[in-house]
Amino acid sequence: MTQNQPPGAPRARIPGPSQPPLPYPRPHAGLWWRCLAVGLALWALTATVTYATRETALLPTLILLGSFLAPVAFVLWAYQRHGRDLGVHLILGCFLTGGTLGVVGASMTERHLLHPSWGMYVGAGLIEEAAKLAALVFMLHRHPRVRGPRAGLVLGASVGFGFAALESAGYAFNATVSLQGIDLRALLETEILRGVLTPFGHGLWTAVTGAALLACRRPNGRFRPASPVVAAWAGVALLHALWDSTHGIALWLVARLTARGLDRTLFTQGHLPWSTDEQRHLFTLFSVGGLVLVALAGIAWVRSLARRAPAWRNTP
């Protein structure tokens, strides 16, 4: 027995469009600069209170805030702009675990292999860049599908910034402790200087080697030491060595240009003895100019890799 249809034209039920779930979390826009602004305010507050009260219990807070603020902000920027599909856990793991392994491995190797000499900076650059690259390989050996220059840029930068944060904390601690006791002024100067220079050092260099490493990764997930990887490692090690030796190069240039009858054996002290105003101005010019040139070279290298990566323009 059939039932009568209700009067009027039949209406078909068409389900409305539904939004598929996002494959990755979307953080609020501008999270990185908000983190940077709040962190700067907290660091300034901690520094002011510590300087006014001379309370040594605040020193760990001051050191950690100053050392991790800039690296964390730049890793957040990289995650928001180009790395959301890589996952928070992988980027965070590269930052913390990769950075720690890089610092520990580089420190152990440098202690046994490096001795004071003209080639010390080159050796330090080769060792530290190799340690960070090995840390990145360790972090990605269980992620065989992660490949390509974009992923290498983001994850390599995460390892590099983790390395820079821990290294800055070590330098800040060393600057704090002196024969006269706690040197708070040296601590603040060290953190400000390294905080400003952080974006142009380890993060850029490891981003370059990471991009080369993952661009040459095999489809089965195995890494291979191809010639582009070795060339990138040698290139960033050279930038690293130039960055570290800028102070000594500036001293040498000033001596060559202005010194007449100067006892150059006193350069072992790390400064120009009996320097004039002209020499001090030239030294500042060469030191800052050298750092700027090395930073610009690193930025240009990263930008060229980003332009050549086809997936870079398609990231959310």
Language model features by range: what are they?
Residues 1-316:
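Hydrophobic alpha-helical segments at protein termini of multi-pass membrane proteins
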